[in-house]
């Protein structure tokens, strides 16, 4: 029997209908389960400076002087004409649009001296002073990077990369912030520069640019407000620890019509790590991602691992994952603190290599030692992370080795999660460990596996969880810890239609009376 009927009436976009090539000029209104601001294309003063390339050597000076001059005049556009521009770190300034013409290529240096002096930044959730970013800004308003040009990072054979080999943010957290200076001098190493990473900025706009061969994370707004990222392309697969877009302790974000091909995570939410992140206490919140592509990479949409300040209110819809390891990836570790809540994902096509839904709160013994062991349940402290209110529905999954892989904490189970209206091809169905109120509804799979294993899962419910290959319902097997108030209901394998229900909408029973529910209803 075909699985096509399982998402009957709910249109899933194809890879040819999303991404930069489909970006319209206008910005469509944002409809989300939470309140979002109005997003409009920023308008800059009409003043323009056309940068002239130096005859020899680096072009850092003429580009930076043009940016500084334009900002002092009150703002405008700095145009980088076609050509290969060798440059060091560039610092964006208020009310300036750095526009890369088609055929323009900013090719960033791999030498430490071209990124000095050290600037304030955050590395893997820890504040410090180091090289910052290839394109950096601190405390600015109304900054933009636009155009059809390219931003190309340094090669991994460069001086910067070699001086980072022994560096870890774990080494700096015991120092006061003023002493966390890593500029490559006096035998100190450096922290890798991100590609585009404004910090403490308002009204950040990125459109149309291609990012290639990033040395580290690519687009990383930190402590920023009102961010619009549209129509960008990241090509960094096979080149370092290259996340695509990391929203780090920032809020009011719209990401649309993007394409990410990364070595690491693609669309990622972060907010600091451990005690350092708790001290800063700035969440990532109100993020909408739509009509975008994730190609290769560790995860399609990701929360973690650095979530000490919290991640809340994230909505992804009408996206395509084509080749990521995992589709929906939630990860942290016991001593990192923070939370993830109110995550909504719908209408996603995902062709993945490993898990479709992946949640890991234990981590690896390599990083946290015995804390990676599930038992004994630990005492709850401010550094105990928690996940709650995750809703994923109206999705089609192919190629995955495991449909669901949830390993939460016995002392802090993941709460109120919903996975429904799913059709999937998978080798294994998977497991859920340490969850409360975990619901799977109308999930139809093609698999030779027949069993979903659950452990310490209270108030779990499985409605219409069917295997088309075997022609029977998936068996729910309790292993290990007690699973109280388990609810399993089966439906016949017949074609049905579904109507998507957005969070906050009311369901009515057959007599027109409101009922409590979430996800979708059979019609």
Segments predicted by a language model, with ranges:
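Short, contiguous acidic/charged loop-to-helix segments that flank catalytic cores in large enzymes
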Residues: 304-307, 331-337, 375-384, 407-410, ...
């Amino acid at each position: 029997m075909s699985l096509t009927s399982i998402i009957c009436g709910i249109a899933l976009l194809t890879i040819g209908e999303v991404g930069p090539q489909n970006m319209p000029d206008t910005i469509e209104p944002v409809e989300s389960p939470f309140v979002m601001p109005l997003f409009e294309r920023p308008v800059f003063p009409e003043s323009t400076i056309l940068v002239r390339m130096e005859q020899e050597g680096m072009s850092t000076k003429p580009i930076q002087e043009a940016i500084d001059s334009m900002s002092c005049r009150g703002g405008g556009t700095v145009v980088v004409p076609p050509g290969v521009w060798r440059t060091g770190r560039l610092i964006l300034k208020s009310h300036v649009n750095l526009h890369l013409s088609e055929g323009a290529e900013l090719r960033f240096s791999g030498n430490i001296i071209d990124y000095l002096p050290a600037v304030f930044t955050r590395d893997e959730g820890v504040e410090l002073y180091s090289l910052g970013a290839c394109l950096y800004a601190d405390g600015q308003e109304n900054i933009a990077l636009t155009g059809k040009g390219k931003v190309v990072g340094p090669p991994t054979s460069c001086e910067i990369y070699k001086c980072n080999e022994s560096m870890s943010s774990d080494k700096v957290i015991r120092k006061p912030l003023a002493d966390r200076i890593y500029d490559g001098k006096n035998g100190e190493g450096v922290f890798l520069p991100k590609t585009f990473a404004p910090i403490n900025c308002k009204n950040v706009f990125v459109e149309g640019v291609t990012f290639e061969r990033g040395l580290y994370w690519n687009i990383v707004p930190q402590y920023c407000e009102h961010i619009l990222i549209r129509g960008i392309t990241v090509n960094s697969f096979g080149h370092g620890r290259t996340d695509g877009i990391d929203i780090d302790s920032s809020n009011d974000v719209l990401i649309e019509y993007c394409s990410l091909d990364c070595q690491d995570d693609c669309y990622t939410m972060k907010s600091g790590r451990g005690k350092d992140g708790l001290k800063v206490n700035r969440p990532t919140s109100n993020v909408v991602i739509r009509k975008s592509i994730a190609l290769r990479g560790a995860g399609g949409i990701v929360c973690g691992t650095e979530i000490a300040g919290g991640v809340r209110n994230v909505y992804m819809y009408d996206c395509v994952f084509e080749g990521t390891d995992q589709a929906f990836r939630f990860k942290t570790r016991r001593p990192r603190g923070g939370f993830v809540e109110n995550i909504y994902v719908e209408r996603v096509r995902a062709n993945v290599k490993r898990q479709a839904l992946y949640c890991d709160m234990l981590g690896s013994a390599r990083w946290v030692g015995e804390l990676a062991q599930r038992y004994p349940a630990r005492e709850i402290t401010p550094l105990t992370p928690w996940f709650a209110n995750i809703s994923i529905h109206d999705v089609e999954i192919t190629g995955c080795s495991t449909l669901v892989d949830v390993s939460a904490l016995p002392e802090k189970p993941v709460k109120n999660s919903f996975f429904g209206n799913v059709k999937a091809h998978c080798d294994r169905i998977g497991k859920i460990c340490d969850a409360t109120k975990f619901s799977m509804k109308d999930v139809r799979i093609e698999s030779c596996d027949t069993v979903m294993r659950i452990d310490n899962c209270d108030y779990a419910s499985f409605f219409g969880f069917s295997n088309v290959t075997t022609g029977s319902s998936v068996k729910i097997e309790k292993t290990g810890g007690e699973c109280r108030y388990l609810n399993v209901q089966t439906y016949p394998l017949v074609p049905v239609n579904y109507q998507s229900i957005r969070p906050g909408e009311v369901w009515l029973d057959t007599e027109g009376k409101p009922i409590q529910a979430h996800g979708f209803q059979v019609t």
